[in-house]
Every structure is written in C-alpha cells, then in structure tokens.
Design a protein with these regions (language model features):
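Short beta-strand His + acidic residue motifs that chelate non-heme Fe in jelly-roll/DSBH
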Residues: 47-49, 67-68, 84, 90-96, ...
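Short acidic-glycine-tyrosine-enriched beta hairpin
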Residues: 71-89
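Glycine- and acidic-residue-biased ligand/ion/polar-headgroup-sensing regions
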Residues: 52-66, 70-71
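Short beta-strand segments
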Residues: 46, 72-74, 115
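Short, surface-exposed charged micro-motifs
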Residues: 37, 57, 66, 81, ...
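A generic "binding-loop/recognition-motif" signal
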Residues: 44, 53-54, 72, 88-89, ...
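Double-stranded beta-helix
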Residues: 2-18, 91-130
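A short glycine-rich, His/Asp/Glu-containing loop-to-beta-strand
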Residues: 12-50, 54
C-alpha cells in the first residue's frame, strides 16, 4: 500500500488592511493566485478600476452587491458569483445597511496592489495609491 505524505504549507493569513470603504484580509497568497476576504461598509464603494495582469472572481457571502462592469450595473446576492476578466472596468458598491462581504480570488501573473488603474475614486486616490 502506497503511503501518501501531505505537506502542509503555512500561509500567512494575518495580513489585514483597512481602507476608506472597509477592509480586506489575505486568506491565501501564492504565486498562482491570491484570495481575499473583502468587507465593504454600508453606503461605501470601491474605486471604478481595471487590471492589466489579473482576472478576479468574487463570491458574495453576505449582503447584496451592486456591481458595475464596463458601465453596466448588476445586482448580485449571497451565493452568486461575479467573473471579471483583466481589462474589464469594475466596481462594487454596498447600498444596504449591513456589511457586504465577498471572497475575491485573483488569477494571473501579478497580484500587486499597484496593478490597479483607477478611473474614478470617491476618496481622491490615484491609480497606485491604496
């Protein structure tokens, strides 16, 4: 009988950052993907942006998300999935009275926060500003 040895790799999941719209924490940070838990406070929204080097997949886990994709607005509920290909302009907004929480999975060849091209930002941030 063949023995299977599983190597457990410890991932630093303690990275947490607050932003004007809410917060995020890293759940997984690898060369091939990055996974974040993102919380958007009531009445807040992220910048309208796009990326050159990564796709994103959002799974809504709490609340209702108002999502803009290339100037078209959609509503997503808990359990629904938003697929965002690189180059797609996108934004998520929380118009509800409770926190919006979603899991973001990034795939591509670069996941740095400097791969954000901001088109519009409620907080006056430039493209490479957090």
């Amino acid at each position: 009988m063949e023995k299977h040895i599983w190597e457990h790799k410890k991932v630093n999941t303690n990275y947490y950052e607050e932003r004007p719209w809410g917060s995020f924490e890293h759940l997984l940070d690898e060369d091939y993907c990055k996974v974040k838990r993102i919380i958007v406070k009531p009445g807040q929204r992220l910048s309208y942006q796009y990326h050159y080097k990564r796709d994103e997949c959002w799974v809504i886990v709490q609340g209702k998300a108002t999502v803009t994709l290339d100037d078209k607005v959609f509503t997503y509920l808990e359990g629904q999935v938003v697929q965002i290909e690189y180059g797609t302009k996108h934004r998520v907004q929380n118009e509800e009275e409770e926190d919006l929480i979603f899991i973001e999975t990034q795939t591509g060849n670069y996941f740095g926060e400097d791969d954000i091209v901001r088109i519009e930002d409620d907080y006056g941030r430039d493209s490479n500003e957090n």
